[in-house]
A protein has these predicted regions:
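Repeated scaffold domains used in trafficking and secretory/extracellular systems
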Residues: 58-66, 104-113, 145-155, 201-215, ...
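Blade-level signature of beta-propeller repeat domains, shared across WD40, Kelch, NHL, RCC1
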Residues: 297-324
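Beta-propeller fold detector
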Residues: 51-53, 96-101, 136-144, 180-182, ...
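N-terminal, intrinsically disordered, polar/charged segments of Gram-positive cell-envelope systems
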Residues: 26-63
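Conserved Ser/Thr-centered positions that define the repeating blades of beta-propeller domains
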Residues: 88-89, 129-132, 232
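Short coil/turn segments that connect the beta-strands within blades of beta-propeller domains
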Residues: 69-70, 115-116, 157-158, 217-218, ...
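Short glycine/acidic-enriched loop and turn motifs that connect beta-strands
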Residues: 77-81, 125-126, 166-170, 266, ...
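C-terminal motif of bacterial Sec signal peptides marking the signal peptidase cleavage site
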Residues: 18-21
Length: 324
């Protein structure tokens, strides 16, 4: 498929969660009073070691966010029980399970907004659910006749963007039949949930050259692969460009206009309000940066950075928590 869908679908893995403390000496605890309105100079280089804990019973994370009240919110599958959520109000020290009305549904490409709103795909449907509510189907009739949807991303509280087109079957180099979706007849549309078409923003170009999408509930931020610039898309289809980023190795996350991403040295915070960049974690030996491991989910709170790492060989997940 043409689009980089790094975050569109996460394969289920068993989960172990590692809590890692960094940026302080053993025995020290340095409270933070930072907010995410700007990148603080106190977010300095750091290294990490720590222990592992478990969340739930065979819980596999599909998506995560920081809720408006600062709580950590993960949605995923728990064994044969289907989808559920786990919430932490104490930066990951303890977790509370939250049942989801759509637990038994087949939903892929899950994305979360800071209010707990979920957007995803079910077959050729775009589905969504407010926190604690059942699934609803978005009206995508404005797209006309379609054969396939490859990705959906929330922009703000009223709009989302969707990519897809015609499905074609071909034989790959191993002699196996494989399907791909061409960027026709639509590509990168901004839609309202009632089916109104706002604009077509990608025009078949951004699909080749953009990825690492993350919404802060006001705009959808992403990386332009051609220039490696951070850009944003609003609900009216307006695109803004910011500065050039380092090479992204893992997942991304956005909160209050700050675009966080994983590179080959750790975690970087790019503040789009003033085009400044600060490294909040430096640790080239971090487990989520190693070969055969991929950082599939990244979230950043006022005090913690949490990276969900997937081991591509053993099909396990480990979550690493760092003080920042």
């Amino acid at each position: 498929m043409k689009r980089n869908l790094f975050l569109s679908a996460i394969l289920p893995f068993s989960l172990a969660v590692a809590l890692c403390a960094c940026g302080s000496t053993p025995g020290e605890s340095t409270p933070s009073e930072k907010t995410q309105s700007s990148v603080s100079q106190a977010q300095t280089d750091s290294a990490a070691t720590g222990n592992e804990i478990s969340i739930g019973n065979n819980f596999s994370i599909e998506a995560g966010t920081v809720l408006s009240d600062g709580s950590i919110y993960f949605v995923g599958r728990e064994g044969a029980d289907g989808f559920c959520a786990y919430v932490s109000t104490d930066d990951g020290d303890s977790w509370t399970k939250e049942e989801l009305p759509w637990a038994d549904q087949t939903v892929v490409g899950i994305k979360l907004r800071p209010d707990g709103f979920m957007l995803g795909m079910r077959g050729q449907q775009v589905v969504y659910a407010a926190r604690g509510e059942d699934l609803k189907t978005a009206d995508i009739s404005a797209l006309g006749a379609i054969d396939g949807i490859s990705a959906v991303y929330p922009i703000d509280g009223d709009t989302f963007t969707v990519t897809g087109g015609r499905t074609e079957t071909f034989v790959n180099e191993d002699g196996q039949e494989q399907e791909t979706i061409h960027p026709l007849p639509f590509e990168d549309m901004v839609l309202q949930y009632d089916g109104s078409l706002v604009t077509q923003w990608g025009e078949g170009i951004a699909a080749d050259q953009a990825g690492y999408y993350a919404s802060d509930e006001e705009k959808l931020y992403y990386v332009d692969f051609e220039t490696n610039e951070c850009r944003s898309l609003d609900g009216a289809g307006q695109i803004d460009s910011y500065g050039v980023l380092a090479t992204i190795k893992g997942s991304s996350f956005c909160r209050n206009g700050i675009f966080y991403y994983v590179d080959d040295q750790g975690i970087v915070a790019y503040d789009t309000t003033n085009n400044s960049e600060s490294r909040i974690l430096t640790d080239t030996l971090a487990p989520f940066l190693q070969d055969d491991v991929s950082c599939v989910t990244l979230i950043v709170t006022d005090h913690q950075a949490i990276a969900v790492a997937a081991d591509l060989n053993s099909e396990t997940q480990t979550v690493y928590r760092y003080e920042i």
